[in-house]
C-alpha cells in the first residue's frame, strides 16, 4: 500500500503546515 502511505504522509504534512500558515497570516 505504498500510494496510501504517501497520501497519509502528505495529509499529515499539510495538516502540520496549516497552523503555521495561520500564525504567519495573523502576525
UniProtKB/Swiss-Prot annotation:
Keywords: Behavior, Secreted. Changing residue 2 to L: In 30% of the molecules. Residues 1-17 have a biased composition (Low complexity). Main cells of the accessory glands of males (paragonial gland). Residues 1-27 are annotated as: Disordered. Its main location: secreted. Transmembrane segments: none annotated. It comes from the Eukaryota. It is found in: Secreted. GO terms for cellular component: extracellular region. Represses female sexual receptivity and stimulates oviposition. This peptide has a low activity. This is Paragonial peptide PS-1.
